[in-house]
Amino acid sequence: MKFGETFTEYLHGEEEWFLEKCRFVEYKKLKKVLKKCKTCNSTKSDDGQIIPSATSSSLSDSCECKACPWCDQMFFEELMKEATDIAGFFRSRVRHLLHLHVATGMQRYMIRLRRCFTDEKQALVQEGQILIQYITMNAIAIRKILKKYDKVHSSENGKNFKLKMRAERIELLHSPWLIELGAFYLNSGLDNVGNFKNSFGRVACENLNEDQPVLKLMLPNSIELEYDLTCAICLETVFNPYALKCGHIFCNSCACSAASVLIFQGIKAAPRHSKCPICREAGVYAEAVHMIELHLLLKTRSKEYWKERMMNERSEMVKQSKMFWNEQTKHMIGY
């Protein structure tokens, strides 16, 4: 079965009720745009519209032109909008799902009360399954259509567009929220996601107490993702991790140190000109994501290490707080 048929079957399958309220890649529409692209063998009408020539039907669909303004305007503009909407929807739904899982205070009490009447945990797990399938199928659709674009135009514009998506932080399978979703499954005791009614792959966390801790996601369609859980600053397993806007993950204390802010002030107090220690991109601290599920995973899977790091961070935080307020006192009273 071709991917177009598989994608259509997915859109009209069991999750159709969910997909009706969210954006997805218009795979067939974009494919039709590529099929109509005969730029090298077309003429222009009097009003400037592109019309395929009579001889174009005898030629192959492959276009030798490196640039195709008509196709590019319709194709990349639409695809960028779709990818942005998909990434935004995925981010908002995962954030809502995880907020329910780690809720505190009165909201936590109300959720526990609801669980007396409904299986709330099962509902969260089911939505997580749907979101994994949603992001995976759309990521495959984007990859397939960009590959087809490069084949039709004999160019590398599709590859360049993927790099642009990564720069714009909308590459679907490189989202910190996907890591959080994987950690959520492990925290729920579901090391094998395929235990449910559909095959959604596997999630595994390996070598937590060794030199190279990793989180592995084996998604549908044989997609394997591996995320390094080593902080690039302290070279240890990330503790109280934050993902910067650029996607790099650091310990909270390490990121604060790199941005020249105190731990108790928080990572989002970093100046706008602060740069990522790895890629050196500025302005990545303001939209940092607190990886709460990943932090809980490390707390349960590596208890001794977590306790040691917690004591060290608290000690350093108290030390920094004392120094800060001593300096403030001296500044106020003059000595």
Swiss-Prot record:
CDD domains: RING-HC_BAH1-like, SPX_BAH1-like. Coiled coil: none annotated. Residues 1-163 form the SPX domain. GO terms for molecular function: catalytic activity, acting on a protein; transferase activity; zinc ion binding. A zinc finger (RING-type) spans 231-280. It catalyses: S-ubiquitinyl-[E2 ubiquitin-conjugating enzyme]-L-cysteine + [acceptor protein]-L-lysine = [E2 ubiquitin-conjugating enzyme]-L-cysteine + N(6)-ubiquitinyl-[acceptor protein]-L-lysine. Keywords: Metal-binding, Transferase, Ubl conjugation pathway, Zinc, Zinc-finger. InterPro entries: BAH1, SPX_dom, Znf-RING_euk, Znf_RING, Znf_RING/FYVE/PHD, Znf_RING_CS. Its EC number is 2.3.2.27. PROSITE patterns: SPX, ZF_RING_1, ZF_RING_2. Pathway: Protein modification; protein ubiquitination. Belongs to the RING-type zinc finger family. The RING-type zinc finger domain mediates binding to an E2 ubiquitin-conjugating enzyme. PANTHER family: E3 UBIQUITIN-PROTEIN LIGASE BAH1 (PTHR46764), E3 UBIQUITIN-PROTEIN LIGASE BAH1-LIKE-RELATED (PTHR46764:SF2). This is Probable E3 ubiquitin-protein ligase BAH1-like. It comes from Arabidopsis thaliana (Mouse-ear cress).
